[in-house]
């Protein structure tokens, strides 16, 4: 069973009012997107397609994929006007694959357990989503 992960990193992060897109901001010495890519790179996923903004394709190829030796990244493609278009472009870049996982590259805290459990669930149910419980720690 071949599984491909599509990592979306084409967002502008306009609500952050920053000149740097949030997936490329530094967190602990690395760009935010590094953490998601590293986790998927070390997972049972067979291939990764990185979808990024038009002006970031070459940057991602050289300063992310090559620099950090992400060997499972088989393609870096241009995103679209919105998330839907970016997902579509990622799907178009998929070669033969049985399952596709879609992850937001600006979310660095995906875990191996989430990925492995998702792959197992896909084998049984053909579709799934990952959610985390919200914990409210303050009193109103």
Language-model segment annotations:
Residues 1-2, 96:
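Short, Lys/Arg-enriched, disordered terminal segments
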Residues 2-57:
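N-terminal glycine-rich phosphate-binding loop and ensuing alpha1 helix
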Residues 11, 19-22, 47, 72, ...:
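Residue-level signal for pocket-adjacent positions within structured domains
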Residues 15, 23-24, 48-51, 74-81, ...:
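Short N-terminal micro-motifs specific to bacterial/archaeal maturation
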Residues 17, 25-28, 71, 110-111, ...:
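Generic, ordered loop/turn and secondary-structure boundary motif
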Residues 18-21, 61-64, 113-115:
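Short amphipathic alpha-helical segments
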Residues 34-97:
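Conserved N-terminal catalytic core of the sugar/cofactor nucleotidyltransferase
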Residues 75, 81-140:
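Conserved beta-loop-beta/alpha segment of the NTase-like Rossmann-fold superfamily
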